[in-house]
């Protein structure tokens, strides 16, 4: 099932990136297509705890491609205001990594922040493709 979602995500992303509306700069308005929604992997191992209280739903995240990562050749790091939070999950990063390698500009933002009583945290975010339309 996870493999089917990964393949579907890759097909949808490739199709969307192939369709790129172009307009003169003065005629552009912002639009976007959400490519995937993910939980941050490795959240407890990085800086999330130190910045947790400052993060808000809607905050922009920075996706950083780590092609030389020794543990995962498709690694995509997730940062908030220059603080490393974790990674795009290994099971969901191939299509995003491939598009970043091709020079496509994908963006991300926080969609949900959850803290449990046992101090575990979950950060959900969406990866999206910014578009311009006439």
Spans of features found by a protein language model:
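Conserved active-site motif detector
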Residues: 2-134
């Amino acid at each position: 099932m996870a493999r089917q979602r990964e393949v579907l995500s890759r097909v949808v992303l490739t199709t969307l990136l192939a369709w790129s509306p172009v307009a003169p700069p003065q005629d552009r308005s912002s639009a976007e297509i959400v490519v995937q929604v993910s939980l941050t992997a490795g959240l407890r191992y990085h800086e999330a705890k130190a910045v947790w209280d400052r993060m808000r739903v809607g905050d922009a995240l920075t996706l950083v491609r780590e092609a030389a990562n020794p543990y995962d050749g498709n690694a995509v790091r997730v940062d908030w205001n220059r603080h490393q939070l974790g990674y795009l999950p290994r099971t969901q990063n191939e299509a995003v990594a491939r598009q970043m390698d091709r020079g496509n500009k994908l963006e991300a933002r926080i969609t949900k922040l959850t803290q449990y009583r046992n101090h575990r945290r979950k950060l959900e975010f969406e990866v999206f493709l910014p578009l311009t339309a006439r």
